[in-house]
Amino acid sequence: IRGFAIGEDIVTSPRAIYDIEIKPADTGVAVNARVSNETAHRLQSRRRSMAGPSGCGLCGIESIEQVTRDIAPLQSQALPSQVALDKALTDMRARQVVSQSTSGAHAAVWCDMEGNIVSVREDVGRHNALDKLIGWRSLNPTDGFVLVSSRASYEMVAKAAPAGDGG
């Protein structure tokens, strides 16, 4: 929830989420997040007409204006070396535990600048895997870069940028 809210620019900081409550429901789980009035207004203006999407970053939007959003430019930072990228790519598959057992999960990983994998988040939906990683990063800010096991679409880049994950 935290990563989705940050990646979708619903909140500008993890501190804007006061409380998260998860309850069993008839057909799954219900998640309630307590946020400020300003955040609630932002959420209402970005409302989508579907619950629990597992994939498409544009699915469920109600108007074309919701496709683009203002994204603050990231501060200039060093890029990972080719050696670091090669190391992370080589090591990523071995760290994808869910994918190894199901052959049906995407991964988003956080790597340090040397290409060492620091965190792995997996999900059937590539956007969800990235949301999970963004949520983890909001609690564990470190230098590094994101690597995903699937294509990095416009929506995924736009999701990672507000979290400061431009590397």
Which role does the model predict for each range below?
Residues 1-108, 113, 119-120:
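Intrinsically disordered, low-complexity regions enriched in acidic/Ser/Thr/Pro/Gln residues
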Residues 22, 158-159:
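Short, flexible, solvent-exposed loop/turn segments with mixed acidic/basic and small polar residues
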Residues 153-157:
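Acidic, divalent-metal-coordinating active-site segment for phosphoryl/phosphodiester hydrolysis
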Residues 163-167:
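A conserved acidic, glycine/proline-rich C-terminal tail/linker
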Residues 98-150, 162:
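Glycine- and Gly-Pro-enriched alpha-helical subdomains that act as flexible
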